[in-house]
Amino acid sequence: MTSSVSLSICGDVERPVRLAAAELRSLMDAELVADFHCREGWSRFDERWRGVRLRTLLAYAGAADDAGYVTVGSGEYTAVLTRAQADDDRVLLALDHEGAESPRPSGFPRLVGPAEWDCFLSVKSVDRIEVTRQPQQATAETIALARLER
């Protein structure tokens, strides 16, 4: 992951933060092995990811307990998770894939989760996490489906 990575955590948090790549790495606390199923009809099995649990990042910024939604974004691409989804042990911001540090051009940091997730929730090149009391506008599914129609 390159030094140009910068992730902001904002919204209903005690301490809005901006984390650089080295700071994200220092928080790494999880590994996930999960299948990935794309709506295009292909799958990858037993993908190994290492990174920071999303709930760890939320705690680091002091996310409000009554904020029920987490928006994860990369530019105009946004996925909205419920707080329960975000707090799941299997949801992380991946920094490594298959044992190798992954650079930003490959989509890192990347939101990854359990195999039952819709593929469009796997946001690549995450640049912000926003904690809110009300759900924000999610664009992930619309953008992903438009790409499939090409």
Report residues per predicted region.
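Extended, aromatic/histidine-rich regions of cofactor-dependent oxidoreductases associated
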Residues: 1-29, 60-150
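Solvent-exposed edge beta-strands and adjacent loop segments
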Residues: 25-39
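Mid-length scaffold segments of soluble, non-membrane domains
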Residues: 37-77
